[in-house]
């Protein structure tokens, strides 16, 4: 039987190292082999190797390593392999900023496994204190793609100050060769214990609903005659188009495309809604959130293709 085993998993990108804004890019676990989470020699050796792996990985992704929950699950593969006598090391691959295909995380997996093989081959892991394993922070699910802090939102005649958490969700195209985004409001309110891959300090900024451009476009060619950035600065977020190309899964400009038959619902900011609205300060529109992506309207906008199509 193998003395050591590695159990590799993909993990949500929304895990963070507990109490920090850093993603849990890699999470380790020496799985429990019983409900009591006892530590025998087999599990202890897995812990020692993980401590060494973490010490190496901190050089490449400082603060971005977490410790996965060790609650016992009798149906889990890793828990059973540990129980059967192989020192099992779970490696979870989470998120890394600007790495949607997890290419950087693949490198960190390589470094992790190579460092483990080294310490096992040399036997140096035997001298490691397992108390160091407990110092690796737990991973926690408190991370979102975009966090807007301290915004003012008017509702039923009252003004409220709140944070807005947004996740940019991938939707596979047919054939699974590419994807587009359909973002959602993940949470609202006091989110001081949550973090964002991108964070906007919004004190003094108000949430402003987007307007529908009054002229209906005949087809996609009409977009060439529009200054879409100026339309955004003027508060327009939706364009009606009579003939929307069938192959379009998302808009080619930073405004949502709407068919004549589609009625846009009055603006409400709720959990689960598509996050699309403007931010304004001192009676001036300064930013726009389009399908969960924040754009600064004082800067040039190019190659933005993440707006929605409502047929």
Model-derived features: where do they sit?
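Short acidic-aromatic active-site loops that bind/stabilize oxyanions
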Residues: 43
């Amino acid at each position: 039987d193998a003395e050591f085993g590695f159990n590799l998993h993909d993990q949500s990108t929304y895990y963070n190292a507990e109490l920090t804004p850093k993603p849990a890019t890699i999470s380790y676990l020496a799985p429990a082999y019983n409900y009591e989470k006892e530590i025998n020699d087999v599990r202890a050796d897995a812990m020692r190797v993980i401590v060494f792996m973490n010490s190496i990985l901190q050089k490449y992704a400082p603060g971005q390593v977490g410790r996965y929950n060790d609650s016992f699950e009798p149906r889990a593969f890793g828990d059973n392999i540990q129980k059967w006598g192989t020192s099992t090391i779970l490696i979870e691959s989470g998120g890394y900023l600007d790495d949607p295909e997890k290419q950087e995380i693949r490198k960190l997996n390589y470094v992790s496994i190579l460092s483990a093989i080294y310490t096992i081959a040399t036997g140096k892991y035997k001298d490691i204190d397992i108390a160091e394993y407990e110092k690796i922070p737990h991973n926690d699910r408190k991370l979102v793609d975009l966090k807007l802090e301290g915004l003012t939102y008017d509702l039923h005649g009252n003004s409220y100050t709140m944070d807005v958490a947004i996740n940019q969700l991938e939707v596979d195209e047919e054939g699974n060769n590419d994807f587009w985004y359909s973002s959602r409001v993940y949470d609202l309110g006091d989110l001081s214990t949550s973090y964002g891959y991108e964070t906007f300090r919004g004190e003094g900024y108000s949430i402003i609903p987007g307007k529908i451009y009054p002229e209906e476009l005949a087809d996609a060619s009409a977009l060439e005659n529009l200054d879409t950035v100026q339309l955004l600065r003027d508060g327009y977020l939706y364009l009606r188009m009579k003939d929307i190309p069938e192959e379009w899964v998302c808009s080619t400009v930073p405004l949502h495309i709407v068919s004549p038959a589609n009625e846009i619902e009055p603006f409400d900011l709720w959990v689960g809604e598509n996050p699309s609205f403007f931010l304004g300060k001192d009676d001036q529109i300064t930013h726009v959130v389009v399908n969960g992506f924040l754009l600064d309207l004082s800067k040039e906008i190019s190659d933005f293709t993440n707006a929605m199509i409502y047929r």
